[in-house]
């Protein structure tokens, strides 16, 4: 059996890759594996399938002899924070993050609030493989009561990260993309004194991430044009990532956030070895500018768990991804979009600078082009010979690397596509190189018989 775990837990379309039976087995396997007898914390985003999967997982946990606490709809980072705070045995988040509504997923956290290790994944996988049960969706799904007190504990923890700094006088627009941030983003920013407007703020599992949120910034840009604001923040479905927009509609992505936040820490002598951790997707303009001010950028494979591992290994205090996953020491390196948005707002208020001017002081990004080549098959399921052939082609293309040009190619961890990233100092070079590489790689992939 192929591993059910990808780069960020278990992910797939509901009733296809992610079934009621699989969710039940995950709950049972987790409960059976844990020696710690404290309850398992469970949360979910707003997807329609979330409540059904919650029912399945809790059924499995119950039959394993363990107990659970239902947090209800919540941001993913609430789970790891509360595991540590309440001394719980582990946690599960039911979410497919930024993916469309028909997808869902299962993220598992250990007793330290960290994503489980490969060894732990293998233990769960083994129990699932040995199970012969095929559990069907019950005719009636009974809603489970959510623990509101724990959610309030998480909200208070975010407010406390502001160290008493008020956001009064700041006009901020939030796009909660019909997802997890709908539960608390408005409340948090308003409690800090900000003048807040929120769009896409209903808990709608059919609309989550659809033409909104951190992967589609047009609704937020439009809102800022129509209702002038100092800044805006757009979250993804489970609120573990965020992208900012300044008053002029310019984008503050994860690279800009890392540069600006990192520079603040560097100036305060709080950035260990002047080191930032990011991934192979980080913009070359970011890397070059960071080096010019004395910083070091360490790149990892794509995925916040790889960033997290490198942060621990290199003893860094800040890292993240261009997509808006930012991991900081403030909350034990758990990506939290609301926390990140609060910190950006706090710096602007303390420095008495608008986000537009602060963003101008960062770096000029190189033009980038990201192309997805549809594979029609799961790359990880290819036979070794064909996989080696494609890997060799990728290596050859990626040798094109200098201060002015870079190519990065990888199979997606969540979709059957090959991602081709090309960046250079001008758009013409990017377009021509991207077209050349994409066409050649497509022909190589098309030769594969699987």
Curated annotation (Swiss-Prot):
Organism: Prochlorococcus marinus (strain MIT 9301)
Family from the record: Belongs to the phosphohexose mutase family.
Disulfide bonds: none
GO cellular component, one term: cytosol
Gene3D superfamilies reported in the protein's UniProt record: Alpha-D-Glucose-1,6-Bisphosphate, subunit A, domain 3, Alpha-D-phosphohexomutase, C-terminal domain
Protein name: Phosphoglucosamine mutase
Coiled coil: none
Keywords: Isomerase, Magnesium, Metal-binding, Phosphoprotein
Modified residues (Phosphoserine): 97
Domain of life from the UniProt record: Bacteria
Function of the protein: Catalyzes the conversion of glucosamine-6-phosphate to glucosamine-1-phosphate.
Record field: catalytic activity: alpha-D-glucosamine 1-phosphate = D-glucosamine 6-phosphate
Note describing how the cofactor binds: Binds 1 Mg(2+) ion per subunit.
EC numbers on record: 5.4.2.10
Keyword Isomerase: yes
Reported modifications of this chain: Activated by phosphorylation.
Zinc-finger in keyword set: no
Molecular function via GO: magnesium ion binding; phosphoglucosamine mutase activity; phosphomannomutase activity
Database matches in SUPFAM superfamilies: Phosphoglucomutase, C-terminal domain (SSF55957), Phosphoglucomutase, first 3 domains (SSF53738)
InterPro entries per UniProt: A-D-PHexomutase_a/b/a-I, A-D-PHexomutase_a/b/a-I/II/III, A-D-PHexomutase_a/b/a-II, A-D-PHexomutase_a/b/a-III, A-D-PHexomutase_C, A-D-PHexomutase_C_sf, A-D-PHexomutase_CS, Alpha-D-phosphohexomutase_SF
Record-annotated active site: 97
């Amino acid at each position: 059996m192929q591993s059910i775990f990808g780069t960020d837990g278990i992910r797939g379309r509901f009733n296809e890759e992610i079934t009621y039976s699989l969710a039940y087995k995950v709950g049972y396997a987790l409960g059976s594996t844990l020696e710690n007898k404290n309850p398992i914390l469970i949360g979910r985003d707003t997807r329609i399938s979330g409540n059904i999967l919650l029912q399945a997982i809790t059924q499995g946990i119950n039959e394993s002899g363990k107990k659970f606490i239902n947090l209800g709809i919540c941001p993913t980072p609430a789970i790891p924070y509360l595991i540590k705070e309440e001394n719980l045995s582990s946690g599960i988040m039911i979410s497919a993050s930024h993916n469309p509504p028909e997808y869902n997923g299962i993220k598992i956290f250990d007793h330290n609030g960290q994503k489980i290790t490969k060894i732990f994944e293998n233990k769960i996988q083994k129990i699932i493989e040995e199970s012969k049960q095929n559990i069907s969706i019950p005719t009636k799904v009974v809603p489970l009561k959510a623990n509101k007190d724990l959610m309030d504990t998480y909200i208070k923890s975010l407010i406390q990260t502001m160290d008493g700094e008020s956001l009064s006088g700041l006009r901020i627009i939030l796009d909660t993309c019909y997802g997890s941030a709908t539960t608390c983003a408005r409340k948090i920013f308003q409690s800090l004194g900000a003048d807040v407007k929120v769009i896409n703020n209903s808990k709608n599992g059919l609309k989550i991430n659809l033409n909104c949120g951190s992967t589609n910034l047009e609704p937020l840009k439009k809102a800022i044009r129509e209702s002038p604001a100092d800044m805006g923040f757009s979250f993804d479905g489970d609120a573990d990532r965020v992208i900012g927009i300044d008053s002029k509609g310019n984008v503050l992505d994860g690279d800009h956030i890392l540069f600006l936040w990192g520079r603040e820490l560097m100036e305060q002598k709080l950035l260990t070895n002047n080191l930032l951790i990011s991934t192979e997707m980080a913009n070359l303009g970011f890397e070059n500018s960071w080096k010019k001010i004395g910083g070091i950028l360490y790149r990892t494979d794509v995925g916040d768990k790889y960033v997290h591992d490198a942060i621990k290994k290199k003893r860094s205090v800040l890292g993240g991804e261009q997509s808006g996953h930012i991991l900081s020491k403030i909350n034990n390196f758990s990506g939290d979009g609301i926390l990140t948005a609060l910190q950006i707002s706090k710096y602007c208020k303390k420095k008495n600078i608008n986000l537009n001017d602060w963003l101008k002081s960062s770096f000029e990004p190189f033009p980038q082009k990201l192309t997805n080549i549809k594979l029609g098959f799961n790359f990880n399921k290819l036979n070794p010979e064909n996989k080696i052939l494609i890997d060799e082609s990728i290596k050859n293309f990626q040798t094109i690397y200098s201060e002015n040009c870079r190519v990065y190619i990888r199979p997606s961890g969540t979709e059957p596509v090959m991602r081709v990233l090309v960046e250079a100092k001008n758009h013409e070079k990017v377009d021509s190189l991207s077209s050349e590489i994409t066409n050649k790689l497509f022909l190589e992939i098309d030769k594969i018989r699987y």
